[in-house]
Structure formats: structure tokens, C-alpha cells
Amino acid sequence: MRKLRIPLVIVGAYFLMQSSCEQNNQNIPYVPVNFDINLNLPSYTSLNFPGEHLIVQGGSKGIIIYRYTMDEFVVLDRHATFDVTLGCHVAVESDGITLSDESECSDSKWIILDGSVMQGPATLPLHRYRTSWNPPIIHVYN
């Protein structure tokens, strides 16, 4: 009985790894991100206030930086996650909280606070980048 368990565990682990690889096919392309933003510079002063956002170049389709609180930032890639092969990007709607892709892509919506899906057909959140905050510098990286 013991000899039978080892092959079953190996086969089970193999299928588990295969299924997790299939899920990664919907991930956005990996692009190295590593930059600093000085909020004292005129180009970035809008980020001095919670609830404001800024779109900068970088990532796969651009990057959205959102100031959540005085000490917290949310940084998301603009690459829509419904079907990454379409290459669609998200934009910030007029309410400043909702992100949406073009209707010809999927008409999905995400929330800027964490990148989670508000309305499908997309099921995956937007890719979130890491940040560190040492006033007035925000460091964004993956």
C-alpha cells in the first residue's frame, strides 16, 4: 500500500502544477518595473492628496498610481485582464474610483482601491506593483 501512495502523490503533484500553469496564461506580460517619483516635482503634485491618481508610462500598458491615504499608494498595471492577448488597457472613469476597459474588449470594470473586478466578464484582478514610501519619494517596483 505504501508503494502505491508515492506514485499517486507524484502524479497528483504533476497535475496540480499543470493546472496552475494554465491559469498563468491569463497573466499580463512580465515587464520589469523599478522607478522613483518625487512628489515635490510639479508633474506629480496631484498625488499629494488622497483620492487622486496619475497615469505614467511603464509596465505592460501603462501604470496607474493612486493615493489611497496619506501613507498608502496603490499602483496598478493598465493591462486589462479579460483576454490579455487583445492588449486592451483600462482607463479611470469620471468617478475616480472605477477602472474600465474599452467596450470592444470586454466592458469589464475594476476598482482602483485594489484592482479587483467589479463587473465581468473579467475574473482576474489587475496586476498590482509594490511600493515603498519615504516622503516625498514613492518607489514603485515588482
Where are the language model's segments positioned?
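Short Gly/Pro-enriched turn/cap motifs at secondary-structure boundaries
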Residues: 120-122
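Cysteine-rich micro-motifs
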Residues: 54, 97-106
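N-terminal pre-ligand scaffold of iron-sulfur
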Residues: 22-96, 111-112, 125-142
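Short metal-binding segments enriched for Cys and/or His
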Residues: 109-117
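Sec-dependent bacterial lipoprotein signal peptides
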Residues: 1-21
